[in-house]
Amino acid sequence: MREQLTALKHEALDKAEVAKSEQDIQAIRVAYLGKKGPITEVLRGMGKLSAEERPIIGALANEVRDEIKNKLDEKSKKLQEAAIKQQLEQESIDVTLPGRPALQGAIHPLTAVVTEIEEIFLGLGFSIGEGPEIETDYYNFEAMNLPKDHPARDMQDSFYVTEDLLLRTQTSPVQARTMEKFAGKGPVKVVVPGKVFRRDDDDATHSHQFMQVEGLYVDKKVRMSDLKGVLETFAKQFFGQDRSIRLRPSFFPFTEPSVEVDVSCGICSGKGCRVCKQSGWIEVLGAGMVHPRVLEMSGFDANEYSGFAFGMGVERLAMLKYDIDDIRQFYANDLRFLMQFKDV
């Protein structure tokens, strides 16, 4: 048996040395060390040996088995290293190629528009205010001269949270909250950007959620001409120095008198086109002189103080400025649309 084991060892080691792949190594391992291999057969036949030969042959068989196993493991490692080296040579990286830049995001167009509006009014001496999006019925309606039985309430379908709380339908409630903080002493000069909510069906020009910027200026001897001057300055800085505005009579419960504000069409320079419906003007916001009752409810003496207020839809301004025809694009999270404003 000694000669048989020695012969098996040399035979297995020679085959391992010339093995070309992992498959060859596995085949040798099964052939010589497997359950049906010759070394296993030798170990099974040890029962026929004498008591003196049994430990000697057993030790030799284990030694041969370990030597073959170690040789196969060593050869397998070399083959793996050679395969990795070959793969690296074939898949070498050209480090001279320029890297791929990381994808950079962009400011959302509505954020960019709000920021621009804020900067314009900060330059005009206004401060930035804010108020709650879940508002009380009092501040959203009554403080804005809309009592519970006022017919104008039917014009706005609202999202009520409780009987007395609702998602604000306008940023106007911040007018009352801000004036209350000043305790009847002016001047009050603030713009308030924020989200508002109405039960509108979403389409190309309507959304159940949109953004407004509210403006308020209260002081002694504030006049309608002050309102026009501020809004004309805003229009020229926002749309371009060649633009002008006009005021049309309108009605809002919280202002008296009230006006709709149009800006001259930038497509046709006021001559008339499809965009402005041949009028030369495009409606952009509502405004007016603060109603005396709103001043009184907020703690100001309407005989001593006056003021103006205005409200503009951010999405509408953005659509006009960037020639966007569908308000839903602002909220679709489509990168193809949003990345167009990367340099805005």
From Swiss-Prot:
Primary localization class, coarse: cytoplasm
EC numbers: 6.1.1.20
Cofactor(s) the record lists: Mg(2+)
Any Gene Ontology biological process: phenylalanyl-tRNA aminoacylation
This protein's GO CC annotations: cytoplasm
Residue numbers binding Mg(2+): 256
UniProt KW Protein biosynthesis keyword: yes
GO molecular function: ATP binding; catalytic activity, acting on a protein; magnesium ion binding; phenylalanine-tRNA ligase activity; transferase activity; tRNA binding
Catalytic reaction list: tRNA(Phe) + L-phenylalanine + ATP = L-phenylalanyl-tRNA(Phe) + AMP + diphosphate + H(+)
Comment on bound cofactor: Binds 2 magnesium ions per tetramer.
Annotated protein name in UniProt: Phenylalanine--tRNA ligase alpha subunit
Source organism per UniProt: Shouchella clausii (strain KSM-K16)
Gene this protein is translated from: pheS
